[in-house]
Amino acid sequence: MDSLLARVKRAADADALNPAQEGVTGGPDAAGLPDVSTSSPGGGGAGDKLKEKMDEYKDKLINEIENLPIWAIVLIIAGSLLFLVCCVYCVCRRSCRKRKKKEGKKGLKGAVDLKSVQLLGNSYKEKVQPDLDELPVNMEDNEDAESTKSEVKLGKLQFSLDYDFQKGELSVNVIQAADLPGMDMSGTSDPYVKVYLLPDKKKKYETKVHRKTLNPVFNESFTFKVPYAEVGSKILTFAVYDFDRFSKHDQIGQVQVPLNSIDLGRVVEDWKDLQSPDTESEKENKLGDICFSLRYVPTAGKLTVVILEAKNLKKMDVGGLSDPYVKIALLQGTKRLKKKKTTIKKNTLNPYFNESFGFEVPFEQIQKVTLIITVVDYDRIGTSEPIGRCVLGCNSSGTELRHWSDMLANPRRPIAQWHTLQEVPEKN
C-alpha cells in the first residue's frame, strides 16, 4: 500500500514538472500569454493616438485662419497687442504703488514727534524759530538788495537840436537808440519814438517803427514852431515805445530836455540815458485806448470798420465812470459823407462793443477820404462830451497812418490795432 502511494506521488510530480518547463522554453505563444513588450494597455499606442488628434486640430485651426478675411486677422492681432499692453501697464502700476508705499514708510520713520519737541523747552525753540522782531529788518534789507538788482538799464538815445532864431523854429533830429531792453517774447523789440513839447503837447511826431531790433537807427527830423519868448518854458520829450499791433504799446523809457538848460546858439548833439516814465508822462494816455479793425475790398469799393472795445477811458461822470459810445465819421476834405455810431454802454470805463459798420468808398476815392473815430460820453440831460478820437487816412501820421497803410496793403483782410485817444480840438 505504501509503495502504491509512493508511485502515484512520483507520477503527479512528473506531470507538474513538464508543463512548467514548456512555459519557460516555449515563449509567450506556447504559454498563451500576451506579448508585454509590444502591446501594453497604457503604452505607446495611446500616445500615438493623442499626437494624431493634436495634429488634426492644428490642421483645422490653420485652415480656419487661412479662410478668415484680412480685417479679422488684423483685429485679432490688435486685440492681442492691446491685451499685452494692458498686462504690462498693470504690472508697472502695481510695482510703482509698492515703491511709493516703501518710500512713504521710509519718510514716516524720519517724522518728528511734536510732543518730544515741546518737552525740549525754549532752548530748542530759540534755535529753530528766531525772534520775530529781527525778521522785518532782514526782510527790508533783502528788499533793498533786490531793488538794486532789479534796476535795469533802459538804453540810451542820440539826438540833435538846431534852433532857427529868425523863423522861430526848433529842428529836432532823432538819430538812433542803443541797448534797448527786449520787450517781446523773442527778446527783441519793435521800437519807435514819439517827440513832443511839454506842457501843451499840441503837436506830436512819431518816427517809423523798426522791427526786431534793440539798436534802431532812425535819422528822422521834425520841426516845431516855438517863438523865442516861449522857449524857456518848453520841455522837449522823447518817448520810446515798443510797437504792438494787438495790444497797448509799452513805453520803454523817455528823455526830457528842458530847453532853458541848453545853448540854442549852436547845434546840440548828445546821448541821453532813457529814464522810467514818471506819473506825469504816463498821464499822456489819460483819455484811454480804443481797438478797432479796418477792412477794404477794392473791387466792391467797401470799407468795413469793426469797433471792438475801449479801455481805461477818462472818468467823465461824478460817480467816476462814463457812459461811452463811439461815433464813426467818413469825410472827404471838409465834407462829411457818412456818419454812424455804436450803442451806449452804461457805467463803464472799459466798454466792449464788437459792432460792425460798412461804408461805400470807390477805389479812386480811398486815397482822399478821412476816417474819424470819436469816443463820446453820453449825457441824457446836458450835452454829450467827447472823450478822445483817432483820425485815419493818407494824411494822418504815426500809428494811425500805419494802420491805414496796412489796410490798403492787405485788401479783403481785417487789420485790428489799438490806438491811443487824442484830444478833440474845440470848435470855434
Swiss-Prot record:
Specify the C2 domain's residue ranges: 153-272, 286-419
Keywords annotated in UniProt: Calcium, Cytoplasmic vesicle, Membrane, Metal-binding, Phosphoprotein, Repeat, Synapse, Transmembrane, Transmembrane helix
Tell me the impact of changing residue 358 to T: Confers higher proteolytic stability characteristic for isoform 3 to isoform 1
Its domain of life reads: Eukaryota
Instruction: Supply the InterPro entries for this chain.
Output: C2_dom, C2_domain_sf, Synaptotagmin
Q: Where does Ca(2+) 1 bind?
A: 184, 190, 242-244
Entry similarity comment:
Belongs to the synaptotagmin family.
List this protein's GO terms for biological process: calcium ion-regulated exocytosis of neurotransmitter; negative regulation of calcium ion-dependent exocytosis; synaptic vesicle endocytosis; synaptic vesicle exocytosis
By its UniProt entry, which CDD domains does this protein fall under?
C2A_Synaptotagmin-1-5-6-9-10 (cd08385), C2B_Synaptotagmin-1 (cd08402)
Q: How does it sit in the membrane?
A: Single-pass membrane protein
Where along the chain is Ca(2+) 2 bound?
184, 242, 244, 250
Listed GO CC annotations: axon; dense core granule; plasma membrane; synaptic vesicle membrane
Q: What is the official name of this protein in its record?
A: Synaptotagmin-1
Q: How is the cofactor bound?
A: Binds 3 Ca(2+) ions per subunit. The ions are bound to the C2 domains.
Phosphoserine PTM sites in chain numbering: 123
For the region Phospholipid binding, give the residue spans.
Answer: 147-395
Q: Which residues cross the membrane?
A: 68-92
* A Gene Ontology molecular function term of the record: phosphatidylserine binding
Keyword Repeat attributed? yes
